[in-house]
């Protein structure tokens, strides 16, 4: 058995990158992931703090709905969600305009990353309910004395959140950010539904086996050669897909480990 190859080559890596349109798909992925993660972080940080510290009417009901979003799979409501973004009426404004003009003002957001931005900002991004729950658990374990001292010094709720809570939640913010990046990066279902021409890297990786059927016309390799290289190409496709995530994790590992320990999640 030969453990190390005698002749090293990057052909499989090049074929995987070509078949996946790596440059275009990685740009599309970044355009989707970065703004979505930032918007989602803003929403879940505020919502988690609100559920942990403020008592208001309907709080229990809203938290129950939050848990409901964690349990219910997106496949159960994808049809109305797709229909909403196909004929987006700007949260009812387009329908209101239609009462006076006779024609509803709608726009299709399909094949645009703004679909993910809106969901992230409105608290319905990928796994937003889980992140709110995690942050709620963290904030509930935070000493009340610091917030009380800030209020005595004249800080309102928002200033207390910005000056006291956020600086002490760095590890949890990084943890939630990592979770969010990974889930958006690896998402196939929503990406394949809302994108129709240019796809992110998760869709390209899933379709790599099919794309390899056409690689012989692109790269000049014979179909028989590609058959023998298939497993190596698929492995290289997985490698170049997860490589950016691995690099990110290397730099954020310390915060991630600390955040998991302080999140209040056990089991």
Role assignments for model-derived ranges:
Residues 1-267:
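A structural signal for multi-pass alpha-helical bundles of membrane permease subunits
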């Amino acid at each position: 058995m030969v453990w190390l190859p005698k002749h090293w080559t990057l052909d499989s890596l090049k074929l995987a990158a070509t078949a996946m349109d790596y440059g275009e798909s990685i740009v599309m992925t970044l355009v989707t992931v970065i703004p979505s993660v930032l918007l989602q972080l803003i929403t879940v940080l505020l919502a988690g703090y609100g559920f942990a510290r403020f008592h208001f009417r309907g709080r229990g009901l809203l938290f129950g709905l939050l848990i409901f979003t964690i349990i219910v799979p997106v496949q159960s409501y994808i049809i109305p969600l797709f229909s909403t973004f196909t004929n987006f009426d700007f949260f009812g404004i387009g329908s209101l305009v239609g009462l006076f003009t006779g024609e509803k003002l709608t726009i299709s957001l399909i094949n645009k990353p703004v679909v993910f931005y809106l969901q992230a900002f409105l608290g319905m991004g990928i796994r937003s309910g889980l992140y709110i729950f995690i942050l709620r658990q963290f904030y509930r374990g935070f000493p009340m004395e610091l917030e009380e001292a800030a209020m005595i010094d004249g800080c309102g709720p928002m200033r207390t959140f910005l000056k006291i809570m956020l600086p002490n939640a760095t590890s949890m913010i990084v943890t939630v950010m990592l979770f969010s990046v990974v889930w958006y990066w690896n998402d196939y279902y929503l990406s394949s539904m809302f994108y129709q021409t240019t796809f992110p890297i998760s869709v390209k990786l899933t379709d790599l086996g099919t794309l390899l059927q056409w690689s012989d016309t692109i790269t000049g390799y014979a179909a028989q050669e590609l058959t023998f290289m298939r497993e190596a190409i698929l492995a290289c496709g997985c490698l170049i897909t997860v490589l950016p995530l691995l690099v990110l994790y290397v730099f954020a590992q310390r915060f991630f480990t600390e955040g998991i320990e302080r999140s209040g999640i056990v089991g």
